[in-house]
Structures are given as structure tokens and as C-alpha cells.
Amino acid sequence: MPKKAEKPASFETALKELEQIVTRLESGELPLEQALNEFEQGVQLARQGQKTLQQAEQRVQILLNDTPDAPLAPFAPENDAL
């Protein structure tokens, strides 16, 4: 059973960890079970990164609203479990 990875502290940390996983997988030296575990962790990190980027994009869109007099709506990120 694969270990449940803790959430990385930041987007940059998650990206660096994902890059390391890709390097290990591309080496072709991992046993099948370990490669599958690494792949699973990589998918989770990629999804987390994608969600973080989507939230950042939403925040930017709120800040760049075309109507300068429009009140800013507070940003509330979704609390989805990955």
C-alpha cells in the first residue's frame, strides 16, 4: 500500500518533487511496484499543482476585473481533498 504523501509546503516544493519523480521514472531503473507508487504520487502532485495554478488565475482575474469601480469579491478557495 503506497504511503499517503503530505502536502508540500508550496507550489515550488511540489514542482521540484514532481521533477525528481519524473527523473527517477525516466531512469528506467525502478522496480515495477516502486515505479507505480512514484507515478501515483506524481499524478497527485500534478493535480495539486494544477489546482494551485487555477486558484492563482482566479485571483488574477478578480484583480484585473474590467470594471474599475466594481467591488472586489473575496476569494474563497475550494477545500477539495486530493
UniProtKB/Swiss-Prot annotation:
Keywords: Cytoplasm, Exonuclease, Hydrolase, Nuclease. It is an enzyme of class 3 (hydrolase). It comes from the Bacteria. Its main location: cytoplasm. One of its GO terms (molecular function) is exodeoxyribonuclease VII activity. GO terms for biological process: DNA catabolic process. This is Exodeoxyribonuclease 7 small subunit. The lineage of its organism: Bacteria, Pseudomonadati, Pseudomonadota, Gammaproteobacteria, Enterobacterales.
